[in-house]
Curated annotation (Swiss-Prot):
Source species of the chain: Proteus mirabilis (strain HI4320)
Residues that coordinate or bind N-acetyl-alpha-neuraminate: T58, S60, T63, Q82, R135
Coiled-coil blocks: none
Binding site for Na(+) 1: A56, L59, A339, S342, S343
Sequence ranges on the Periplasmic membrane side: 1-7, 60-76, 145-154, 200-235, 293-325, 397-403, 454-457
Record GO biological process: sodium ion transport
Membrane side Cytoplasmic: residue ranges: 30-46, 93-116, 173-174, 253-272, 357-374, 428-432, 480-496
Amino acids binding Na(+) 2: D182, S342, S345, S346
Result when mutating Q82D: Abolishes Neu5Ac transport
Sequence intervals crossing the membrane: 8-29, 47-59, 77-92, 117-144, 155-172, 175-199, 236-252, 273-292, 326-356, 375-396, 404-427, 433-453, 458-479
Gene: siaT
GO cellular component terms attached to this protein's record: plasma membrane
Note: Rescues growth on Neu5Ac as the sole carbon source of an E.coli strain that lacks the endogenous NanT sialic acid transporter.
Protein name: Sodium/sialic acid symporter SiaT
Length: 496
C-alpha cells in the first residue's frame, strides 16, 4: 500500500466547500441588526433546521473519525450513547423547554439567576466558556492530528485555516449563519458516512452480508463480556449511566444546544428541533459504526494495504485518501472539516452569547446599547477563536498524550456541577441560592477526589458532579433563606 498525494482535484473540492461556507456567512451578515438577531436569530429559524444544527453541533469531527475507529478496534457498545440522547427527550420537552422559553433568555444560565442568584449564573457561564475554549482547541487538534499524514500541509497551517474560517463566518453570520452552515455541514457529513459505507461494501468480497457475518463471528457488536458491572472499565452498564448524564448535560445545561431552543418562534417549533435531531441520531450513527466494521473486514481481506504499525485511530482517513476516487476523497475530507467546523462555530457563538449576556450586560453599571452589545459579541468571537487556536497549536507542538481522557475528565468536572444546578432548580422546590453554592463546592470536591484519588472510570465523573449538587443542595436547603418562587407552574406559556 502506497500513500498517494492528496492531489489538485481533491484540494479544489475541499477549498470549494470552504469558500461556500464563507459565502453563507456573508449572506446572513446582512440580517444581523441587533444582539437578538445575532444570538437568537430573531426567532426566524425553522425547527427542522435548528434540529439539523443540534445534530451537527453534537457530532464533531472527532466523532466522525473515532466512532469508526472504535468499531474497527473493539465493538459497537458506544452506540448506546446515541440512543440515550433520544430517551431523554420527554424530560427535556416537559421540564426544561418551558423554563427556557418563558424567560426569553439569551443565555441558558439566566435561568440560574432567576431561580437562585447571580453566583450560580456566573459559575455556570464561566465554566461553560472555559470548557468550550478547551473543547474547540481539542477538536481542532485531534482533527489536524488525524489528517496531517495524508494532506501534506503543516499542522499549524491546518489549525490556522480551520480556525480562521470558523471565526470569519461565525463573526459575520451570527447564530443564523452558524445554523444554516450547520445544515449544510450536517447533510454533508451524513451523506459522506452513507457514501463511505456503500463504497466499502463494494470493495469487500461478499458485500454487506459478509461484513455483518464476520463482525458477528468476531463478537464485535455487543460482546457478552461487556455486560458486566465495573467501576473502572467502560462496560455497557457503565456506558448507560455515563451517557445518560452526559446527554442530560448536553441537552439541558449546555448553551450551544440550549441556544437552538430559543431561535424558533414557538414551543411547537422547538420540539420539532429535538424531534428532527432524534431522527438523525436514530439513523446516521449506525453508518459510522458500520463503517468501522466494514473497514475491519476489508483490511482482514487485504492486510497488505494496512501499513505496519499504523495507528488505527486514523483508519478512516487512511481509507479515504488511499482507496476512494479522486474528487470523492476531497468531498469526504470536506465532510470531516464540516464536522469540526459545525462544533467550533457553535461553540464560538455560544461563548460570545454567554459573555455578552452573563458578564458584559449583567455586570455593566448602565445598560449597554444594541450597538455596544454587537461590538462586544463580535470581539469575543475573535478573542475566543484566537485563544482556542493558540491552545490547539500548543497541543500540536507539545505532542500531548492522554488528551482524550483529560477531555472527558474535564466534562465531568465542569459539566457535572452545571447539570446538577439545573436539576436542583427544576426538581427540588425548596432548594435556594445558599444551598446551590454548597452543592457547587461539594460537587467540585467530589469530582476532584474521584479524578485524582480513585481509579473510577471517567464516565462516573459527570454522575458524581451532578448528583453531588442535587444531594448537597437538597440537604442544606433548610439552613438558608427560603427559595425564590419560580416553579414549573410559573413556566406555563401561551406559545403554540
Amino acid at each position: 500500500m502506497q500513500l498517494h498525494d492528496f492531489g489538485f482535484i481533491n484540494y479544489a473540492v475541499l477549498f470549494g466547500y470552504l469558500a461556500a461556507m464563507l459565502l453563507v456567512g456573508v449572506y446572513f451578515s446582512k440580517r444581523q441588526k441587533t444582539a437578538d438577531d445575532y444570538f437568537r436569530g430573531g426567532g426566524r429559524v425553522p425547527g427542522w433546521a435548528a434540529g439539523v444544527s443540534v445534530f451537527a453541533t453534537t457530532l464533531s469531527s472527532i466523532t466522525f473519525m473515532s466512532i469508526p475507529a472504535k468499531a474497527y478496534t473493539s465493538d459497537w457498545t458506544f452506540i448506546i450513547g446515541q440512543y440515550l440522547a433520544i430517551a431523554i427527550l420527554p424530560l427535556v420537552f416537559y421540564f426544561y423547554i418551558p423554563f427556557f422559553r418563558k424567560l426569553k433568555i439569551t443565555s441558558a444560565y439566566e435561568y440560574l439567576e432567576a431561580r437562585f442568584d447571580v453566583r450560580s449564573r456566573l459559575f455556570a457561564s464561566l465554566s461553560f466558556m472555559l470548557f468550550h475554549i478547551g473543547r474547540v482547541a481539542i477538536i481542532t487538534y485531534l482533527t489536524v492530528l488525524a489528517l496531517r499524514p495524508f494532506m501534506g500541509i503543516d499542522p499549524v497551517v491546518l489549525i490556522v485555516l480551520i480556525s480562521l474560517l470558523c471565526i470569519i463566518y461565525t463573526w459575520m453570520g451570527g447564530i443564523e449563519g452558524v445554523i444554516w452552515t450547520d445544515v449544510i455541514q450536517g447533510l454533508l457529513l451524513s451523506g459522506g458516512a452513507v457514501l463511505i459505507f456503500i463504497m466499502i461494501c463494494f470493495k469487500v468480497d461478499g458485500g454487506i452480508s459478509e461484513i455483518f457475518t464476520t463482525t458477528a463471528q468476531a463478537d464485535k457488536f455487543f460482546p457478552t463480556t461487556q455486560w458486566r458491572w465495573s467501576w473502572t472499565d467502560s462496560t455497557i452498564p457503565v456506558l448507560m449511566i455515563g451517557f445518560l448524564f452526559a446527554n442530560i448535560q448536553q441537552f439541558t445545561a449546555s448553551q450551544d444546544v440550549v441556544q437552538r431552543y430559543i431561535v424558533t418562534d414557538s414551543i411547537k417549533e422547538t420540539k420539532r428541533t429535538l424531534i428532527t435531531n432524534a431522527k438523525l441520531v436514530a439513523i446516521i450513527p449506525i453508518f459510522f459504526f458500520a463503517i468501522g466494521s466494514a473497514l475491519f473486514v476489508y483490511y482482514q481481506q487485504n492486510p497488505s494495504l494496512l501499513p505496519a504499525g499504523f495507528n488505527t485511530g486514523g483508519i478512516l482517513p487512511l481509507f479515504i485518501v488511499t482507496e476512494m476516487p479522486i474528487g470523492i476523497a476531497g468531498l469526504i475530507i470536506a465532510a470531516i472539516f464540516a464536522a469540526a467546523q459545525s462544533s467550533i462555530s457553535s461553540s464560538l457563538n455560544s461563548i460570545s452569547s454567554c459573555f455578552n449576556s452573563d458578564i458584559y450586560t449583567r455586570l455593566s453599571k448602565s445598560s449597554p446599547s444594541p450597538e455596544q452589545k454587537m461590538k462586544v459579541a463580535k470581539l469575543v468571537i475573535i478573542v475566543a477563536g484566537i485563544f482556542s487556536s493558540l491552545a490547539a497549536i500548543w497541543l500540536v507542538l507539545s505532542d500531548e498524550a492522554e488528551i482524550w481522557d483529560a477531555f472527558n475528565s474535564l466534562i465531568g468536572l465542569m459539566g457535572g456541577p452545571m447539570t446538577g444546578l439545573f436539576m436542583l432548580g427544576i426538581f427540588v422546590k425548596r432548594a435556594n441560592a445558599g444551598s446551590a453554592v454548597v452543592g457547587i463546592i461539594v460537587s467540585i470536591i467530589a469530582v476532584l477526589a474521584a479524578r485524582y484519588g480513585s481509579d473510577l472510570n471517567f464516565f462516573f465523573y459527570g454522575v458524581i458532579g451532578s448528583m453531588s449538587v442535587v444531594i448537597a443542595g437538597t440537604i442544606t436547603a433548610p439552613l438558608f433563606a427560603p427559595a425564590k418562587q419560580l416553579s414549573l407552574d410559573d413556566s406555563e406559556t401561551s406559545e403554540n
